[in-house]
Amino acid sequence: MASPQGGYPPQEGYGQQPVAYGAPVQQPGEAPAPQVHTGGRKKRAYAGEAFEIGSGANAALGGQPPAGGAYGAYPPQQPAYGADPSQMAQGYAPPVAPGVAQMTQQFGAMGVTDPHLMPPQQAPQAPQAPQAPRAVPLNQLYPTDLLTQPFNVAELDYPPPPIVLAPGTSVYPSPYANCPPKYVRSTLNAVPTTHSLLKKSKLPFALVIQPYAALHDAEDQVPVIPDQVISRCRRCRSYINPFVTFLDHGHRWRCNMCNLTNDVPQAFDWDATLQKPADRALRPDLNHAVVEFVAPQEYMVRPPQPLVYLFLIDVSYASVTNGLLATSARCIKESLDRIPNADRRTRLGFIAVDSSLHYFSIPRDGSETSDPRMLVVSDLDEPFLPIPGDLLVTLSECRENIEVFLDKLQEMFQNTQNNSCAMGSALRAGYKLISPVGGKMTVLTSSLPNVGHGALTMREDKKVLGTSKESSLLQTANSFYKSFAVECSKAQVSVDMFLFSSQYQDVASLSNLPRYTGGQTYFYPGWNAARSEDAIKFAREFSDYLSSEIGLEAVLRVRATTGLRMSTFYGNFFNRSSDLCAFPAFPRDQAYVVEVAIDETVTKPVVCLQTAVLHTTCNGERRIRVLTLALPTTQNLADVYASADQQAIATFFSHKAVERTLGSGLEQAREALQAKAVELLSTYRKELAGGSVGGGGLQFPANLRGLPVLFLALIKNLGLRKSAQIPTDMRSAALCLLSTLPLPLLIQYIYPKMYSLHDMPDNAGLPDEQTGEIVLPPPINLSSERIVPYGLYLIDDGQTQFLWVGRDAVPQLLLDVFGLPDRSQLRVGKQNLPELDNDFNGRVRAVVEKSRDHRSKGVGSIVVPHLYVVKEDGEPGLRLWAQTMLVEDRADQGVSLVQWMGSLREKV
């Protein structure tokens, strides 16, 4: 089987054993090499021939280093480091992170509980009268040496540095007053008061915003304020929030953004449902940083839009033969009950596309005929609507006949020989059909649009891959896709692309439509419904896609304290004005990045940044979701570094790198990332580590130790890495992910998770006693050094999973996991694990499934990763693809982590 990467040629350097930075080969936290058993210790079933308990990556539960080898352990003076209780409810009591064992003992002696479980700050007390908050000490800076204390993957699971606010900062002492990191994360949790200090730090100041943490409201409920009493500042239009102050016996409030004094609305303290006075201290908008207001009439330009899905389905030869037409028709039919339709206004339409456009008029249920009528239009230059009505039908009124139509759709085109695809003209026609109401055009296609509007040609050239000319292939080939996207955005039309080609499809051009309309590009390379794994993956994902409670006709704006300005916005939307982002549809599985400029000196001890998303719910209600984040300010560079969030910074630079790739080229994007890593290390060394460090170390704060590793992993990601083997479509699809994924999924896509399964702890793969969630084994570093030849490993980047089977895996392990007595019978490639009647099989399947669980990561996503079984001595293309996930190794044209740290050390 050819690997989806086009089959990497074996490169030198694969599987090399890099030496730990200036240390013996055995990494701290890794058990000694397996010895032949002496018969004296208890052995695992799979280990009879090979190893004893107490060896392998999980030997010390969590790769605990020997005493004294504490990597990035935060010293005990700072019990609050990053402890956000909500972050920690990730389905298991947090694994004892490397080096935290010593901390825990010291805390125990001090009478302090586990540092990971302490609240980030004391709940502020309600002020009797407005008072200036006292200055409180911010996070302390803990320098570490990146060369003598190598990075441990568990550090990526630490929460961000806590936001330290003085007591009394919020109007009421609510634990929910500040925005949780799953919705908004700042790259800096202590904000410089001046532009010059920010510039000196060389750190970016940006927000990573993910307004929704799940595809459905029920999975992530936020307080809804139904009374339509929305109090906003008259000058800056900020919404009242937990950080305002009340004056004049509570009759007026001072805006925490611009300081203007506003009147409190009369109805603010009145409970309209109970018709009696209400306690202001219980109002959600004064206690919760994340709330949703039901909007009154003045927030609507027109009646709320209904949910509209127009399906543009490719019915050319490629799409019929690979099973896309049949699978998508069946999947839509089976998902009709999942499409949101509480207000019974949801409308659907269908256009089939080959060298002509085929419209379908579907009669209402109970009409004389139930048969759909097909109307064919072959004028591709000026596509017209053959009949104005009946092409968009109401789901509730035509439910049965929509099913009749979907059953017949496949038969209509089953014998086609038509190789043309006029998808550009179909998009134009679809726009004509739904632009009066707005809605979503969902494109399902297996072909390159080769006739009509926006026709594209095969432009991939193997000879330019890996050269400077490759970057031109990542740009749009036809201006239609950008200009048409802007038209769509103005008419509240959003486009989603589901692409299934086995040949070049020009993802680079097609992905512009989702990019500017708040949509997404979903890419299924080499997909074929005859492979059950392919059919099941698409069916599950498409059904979740249709069920998602998207927002409609939405706009997003971020306001902030005087002195701060939103300068640049990144993500899939159209930037309508300097600070307004327009979304014809607002998805729930994407994040956005907003860069913040400091225009004038900030004089306040706390700044606030407030994100507001005005949208129509898919049930026809106009709402505003408001997310308010308060951050302390500082004039001290050490505070800025000590409170910087490495994952948010990596997310910001991921978006920057995609922008640079599309603007200047791949090489420039990679060089900019390396230059940034050097600049940050040099700045820290010069400004905060006293200029010169004895012994040639590489100093960086404990909270940023993962940043150089994340930069290397980003440079080696499919979207950016230097290689002559990566098909352009694969690269373009990866760039789409790097610029849209929610933060937890993006970090995993850049630095995948790897779990050792053959020696996982006894509780892994079983439900946790407290939470009932499946316990995952501790993750291990992405280095071939961590892989033993008799091992079984799961490697998961959130899009693809690999189950790596070592060449010396013992027969009992293969029997328990795969039900096969002999290694030679093990099939490699895409598959699902068999369900066998033994405990270990159940635990391995539970770990594979739990690793896919988006909800426990606090994000919405439709993706169900494929699982590939890889034999260490099996199919080379597949093996090399899996090995590209080991970002700490040397591979293809990329350096190892040891080489990378060495080169950074030289440049710093």
UniProtKB/Swiss-Prot annotation:
Q: Which CDD domains match?
A: Sec24-like
Which of this chain's residues are annotated to bind Zn(2+)? Answer: C233, C236, C255, C258
Q: Where is this region: Zinc finger-like?
A: 233-258
Q: Region Disordered: which residues?
A: 1-43
- Per the UniProt entry, what are the Gene Ontology biological process annotations, in alphabetical order? COPII-coated vesicle cargo loading; intracellular protein transport
One GO molecular-function annotation for this sequence? zinc ion binding
Predominant localisation class: cytoplasm
Which cellular component appears as one GO term in the record? endoplasmic reticulum membrane
Reading the lineage from the top rank, the first entry is: Eukaryota
What is its biological role? Component of the coat protein complex II (COPII) which promotes the formation of transport vesicles from the endoplasmic reticulum (ER). The coat has two main functions, the physical deformation of the endoplasmic reticulum membrane into vesicles and the selection of cargo molecules.
- Which family would the database say this protein is a member of? Belongs to the SEC23/SEC24 family. SEC24 subfamily.
UniProt protein name: Protein transport protein sec24
Gene, per the UniProt record: sec24
